[in-house]
Regions:
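Short, Lys/Arg-enriched N-terminal segment that forms or immediately precedes the first helix
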Residues: 131-140
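A generic structural motif
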Residues: 58-60, 97
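Cyclic nucleotide-binding regulatory module and flanking cytosolic helices
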Residues: 1-27, 83
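Glycine- and acidic-residue-biased ligand/ion/polar-headgroup-sensing regions
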Residues: 34, 45, 49-56, 75
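Phosphate-/nucleic-acid-contacting segments
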Residues: 145-188
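Short phosphate-coordinating micro-motif centered on Lys-Gly-acidic
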Residues: 37-42
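His/acidic/aromatic-lined binding-pocket segments of jelly-roll/cupin-type domains
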Residues: 28-29, 45-50, 69-70, 173
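Cyclic-nucleotide recognition modules
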Residues: 68-126
């Protein structure tokens, strides 16, 4: 399990004074596997860092299928950008795939911290920058790499995802069926 300080330092080290401001307003919560942390029908007013556990972000397509498009592990963060930016329910669901320990912070409190503490504002910028970069990489990979190449890249860069996340969610994340993923895995 990762400490809040360890997670913050992973992204952007901050002073003890700034960390104390953040830590005082953060609550550690435990949630069970299969908990829907963010529901597309509800506004979620919290931001979470994952201290322990895994999660996925998914949407429901027009045929009623769940389509996973982000997979999370420890040190990642959970946030509904619709909720954060527009204070409205998001279009996505975030489900825990393992029992989890999360650090929870109210979004409005986080925004006030950003306004009053430059180090925390810079931390927020780094989080947003890294999210934008990762999103762009996934998009470009989907456009330019074969399914086999996407799987090999995931295996090389994030072997823990392959070990811990169910294959049906990995297949969905890669944009392929579980049968196709099984074929790819048998050839590697």
């Amino acid at each position: 399990m990762y400490s809040l300080r360890g997670i913050i330092n992973h992204y952007h080290p901050i002073s003890e004074a700034s960390f104390q401001k953040l830590e005082e307003l953060t609550v550690m919560v435990e949630m069970s596997k299969r908990t829907i942390v963010f529901d597309a029908k509800q506004y979620e007013s919290n931001f979470y860092f994952i201290a322990k556990g895994s999660a996925r972000v998914y949407v429901i397509d027009d045929e009623g299928n769940e389509v996973s498009y982000i997979l999370f592990l420890e040190k990642d963060y959970l946030l509904s950008f619709d909720g954060y930016l527009h204070q409205k329910p998001s279009y996505e669901y975030i489900e825990l795939l393992e029992d989890a320990v999360l650090y929870q912070l109210d979004i409005e409190v986080l925004k006030r911290l950003y306004q009053t503490d430059l180090e925390l504002a810079n931390l927020g910028r780094v989080l947003a920058d890294q999210f934008a970069y990762a999103t762009e990489q996934r998009f470009i990979d989907r456009l330019t790499l074969s399914a086999t190449a996407r799987y090999k890249k995931l295996l090389k860069n994030h072997p823990e995802i392959i070990q811990r996340i169910p294959l049906k969610y990995i297949a969905s994340y890669l944009g392929i069926t579980q049968v196709s993923l099984s074929r790819i895995r048998s050839k590697i």
